C-alpha cells in the first residue's frame, strides 16, 4: 500500500518542513497545492512551471497529487459556468503538463462549488 500525506496537513509549515515531517512519519509521498504555508504559487505554475519543478526537485520525496483549484476562489470559475470553459481548459492543460514533467500521477480538482454572490451555505442548500 502506498502512503501519502497532504502538505496542507501541516498548515503552519513550509513545504520543506512538511516534507521533513512526512519522512519522519515514514510517508515518502506528499500532495501539493495552492494553500497554506506549504503552497506552491499557482500563478507561477500557470506562467512558467519549470521554476516550480526546479524548486520541488530539491526535496527527496515523491509528489503524489496536485490539488488544483480553478480560479482564485471557490466562486471565481465554477466548472458549471460555460463562460469559464476556455480559461479552465487552458489551466488544466498547463497543470497536466506540470504534473507529467514532475511525475505526479493525479490531479485532485476542486471545481468551484459556489457561484458568484452565493454563500457556501446557499450552495449547500441549493
Annotate each PLM feature.
Residues 2-7, 30-32, 63-68, 107-109:
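Hydrophobic faces of well-ordered beta-strands that scaffold small-molecule active sites
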Residues 7-13:
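Short polar catalytic/cofactor-binding loops
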Residues 15-36, 102-103:
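Catalytic domains of carbohydrate-active enzymes, especially glycoside hydrolases
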Residues 17, 55-59, 74-126:
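Active-site acidic/histidine proton-transfer and metal-coordination neighborhood
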Residues 48-70, 125-126:
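Alpha-helix-loop-beta-strand connector modules within alpha/beta enzyme cores
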Amino acid at each position: 500500500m502506498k502512503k501519502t500525506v497532504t502538505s496542507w496537513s501541516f498548515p503552519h509549515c513550509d513545504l520543506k518542513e512538511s516534507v521533513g515531517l512526512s519522512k519522519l512519519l515514514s510517508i515518502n509521498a506528499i500532495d501539493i497545492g495552492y494553500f497554506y504555508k506549504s503552497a506552491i504559487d499557482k500563478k507561477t505554475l500557470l506562467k512558467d512551471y519549470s521554476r516550480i519543478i526546479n524548486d520541488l526537485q530539491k526535496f527527496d520525496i515523491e509528489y503524489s497529487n496536485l490539488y488544483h483549484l480553478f480560479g482564485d476562489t471557490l466562486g471565481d470559475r465554477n466548472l458549471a459556468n460555460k463562460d469559464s470553459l476556455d480559461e479552465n481548459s487552458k489551466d488544466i492543460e498547463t497543470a497536466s503538463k506540470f504534473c507529467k514533467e514532475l511525475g505526479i500521477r493525479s490531479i485532485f480538482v476542486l471545481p468551484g462549488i459556489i457561484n458568484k454572490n452565493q454563500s457556501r451555505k446557499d450552495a449547500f442548500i441549493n
